[in-house]
Each structure stands twice: as structure tokens, then as C-alpha cells.
């Protein structure tokens, strides 16, 4: 995992969509997986996976929000840590020392990596292919993690490959009422936030501030067109492998 010291940043983009209203927030220190969770890692913890595009080194996909959360809990237990999630209520205990999904603010903070531009490498998408697997270069499928350049903080595939589930419920107007310190999304909602774009995304949908949402589909298996969704884990600061 990569340690991110936390800090203040401007979340959103004045040139983006209406739900990207710029506002300054701060996040506490946390650790984030350097790579998206791979099929091999997922199988090691869960025992099997339902990815469409079989490749042990590629990110696990066809994964629901609930399945990602259950993986976080199982990974925590496997390492002797306290699970963050109550799978009856789907509430996250942010004080627990186990693995969880990043908040939307944590995800954007990590993706920006100290930058203020549309992407961590600048405002132009001309260099996106050096950092991401997207519609133009993926060959129509997700690719092995870590094969493109990392962002300035050493995180790989923050753009493209698989779109990443975040912990937050989605609300188009949330930025207008979001707290300035450690925002964790609305208390309820029908969809969860997904960030970063995927192997099937246009460049504009991979921007650091771009927001997307999806029905969390509370089931272990996603049947259909969910081979663009995956995830990576975070832990609140206090020690991580």
C-alpha cells in the first residue's frame, strides 16, 4: 500500500459537469492499494471470482459494491484486523483498522496526487495513453495492473482499466452541502459512487474530478455488463502492509 499523508485540496472542477462543483475539503491520512485488486488477490481471499476477462494479474471485475465490501472484510480478518463493515446494514466503521473502500474525497485526493489539473499529468488528455487503459488503447478488455505509468504518488491505473467503487452514496447535489473535513457522502441513496473510468471509457470520463454512479446491486455475482467495475482498498492511517 501507499501511505498518503492527508491534507486539503480543491475537489471538483469548474469546467466539469454540474455535479463537480469545486469546493475545498481536507482528508485525514490513509493508506491505499498501489494497484487495483487483481483476480489472483481476490481468489486468494474469497476462493473464486466471476471476472469475464480471465487473467490473474488483471483487475477483478464483474464485481458489485457489496462483493467488494465483503472482500474488504475478509481481507481484514485474514490479516487479524478489525473489519470495517457491518454487512447487515452496509455501514462502515471508519475507526476500525481493517480494509475498506475509499471515500469519494479520498479517491479524488489520491488521483490528483497534489495536482490541480484535469488529470494528474496535465489538462490535456493527449498523454492519457501513457497512464491508462481506455477505449482507444485497451483492445476491448481490462489489462494487467501496473503496466502503465503511475501518478506522482506512485498509484497505478487510477484512470481507466476498471472503474473503481467508492464507499459513498451518490447525490448530484452533495458537493453543495458536503462538510469540509473528511466528507463521507450522503447518509443514504440508491446508487454508489464509481470513479476513474474504465477500459471502455472516453478520456473525458477519466478525469480526476469526473463522477459516475451505479446501482450497488446487493448480490455476490453481477450478471451482465459489469465487466468495467472493480476496486482497490484503503485503510485509515495507523499501519498497513
Language model region names:
Residues 1-51, 56-76, 159-160, 167:
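A short glycine-rich, aromatic-capped structural motif
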Residues 2-3, 31-36, 61-62, 100-102, ...:
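Structural recognition of the beta-strand scaffold that forms the well-ordered cores
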Residues 9, 55-129, 165:
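Short, well-ordered surface patches within globular domains
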Residues 14, 37, 48-49, 76, ...:
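Acidic glycine-/aspartate-rich tracts in secreted/extracellular proteins
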Residues 89-94, 100, 132-159, 186-188, ...:
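Short, well-ordered junction/capping motifs at the entry into regular secondary structure
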Residues 149-151, 184-241:
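Disulfide-stabilized, aromatic/cysteine-rich ligand-recognition loop
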Residues 172-178:
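A short, polar/charged loop-to-alpha-helix boundary motif
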Amino acid at each position: 500500500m501507499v501511505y498518503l499523508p492527508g491534507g486539503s485540496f480543491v475537489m471538483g472542477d469548474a469546467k466539469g459537469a454540474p455535479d463537480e462543483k469545486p469546493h475545498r475539503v481536507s482528508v485525514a491520512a490513509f493508506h491505499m492499494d498501489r494497484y487495483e485488486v487483481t483476480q489472483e488477490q481476490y481468489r486468494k481471499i474469497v476462493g473464486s471470482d466471476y471476472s469475464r476477462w480471465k487473467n490473474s494479474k488483471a483487475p477483478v471485475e464483474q464485481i458489485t459494491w457489496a462483493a467488494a465490501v465483503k472482500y474488504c472484510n475478509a481481507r481484514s480478518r485474514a490479516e487479524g484486523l478489525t473489519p470495517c463493515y457491518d454487512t447487515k446494514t452496509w455501514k462502515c466503521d471508519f475507526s476500525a483498522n481493517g480494509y475498506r473502500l475509499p471515500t469519494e474525497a479520498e479517491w479524488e485526493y489520491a488521483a490528483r496526487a497534489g495536482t490541480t489539473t484535469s488529470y494528474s499529468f496535465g489538462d490535456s488528455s493527449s498523454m492519457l495513453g501513457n497512464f491508462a487503459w481506455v477505449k482507444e488503447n485497451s483492445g476491448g478488455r481490462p489489462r494487467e495492473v501496473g503496466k502503465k505509468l503511475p501518478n506522482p504518488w506512485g498509484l497505478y491505473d487510477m484512470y481507466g482499466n476498471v472503474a473503481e467503487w467508492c464507499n459513498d452514496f451518490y447525490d448530484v447535489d452533495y458537493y453543495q452541502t458536503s462538510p469540509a473535513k473528511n466528507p463521507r457522502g450522503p447518509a443514504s441513496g440508491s446508487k454508489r459512487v464509481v470513479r476513474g473510468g474504465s477500459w471502455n471509457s472516453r478520456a473525458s470520463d477519466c478525469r480526476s474530478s469526473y463522477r459516475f454512479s451505479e446501482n450497488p446491486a446487493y448480490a455476490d455475482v453481477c450478471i451482465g455488463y459489469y465487466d468495467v467495475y472493480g476496486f482497490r482498498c484503503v485503510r485509515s492511517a495507523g499501519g498497513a502492509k
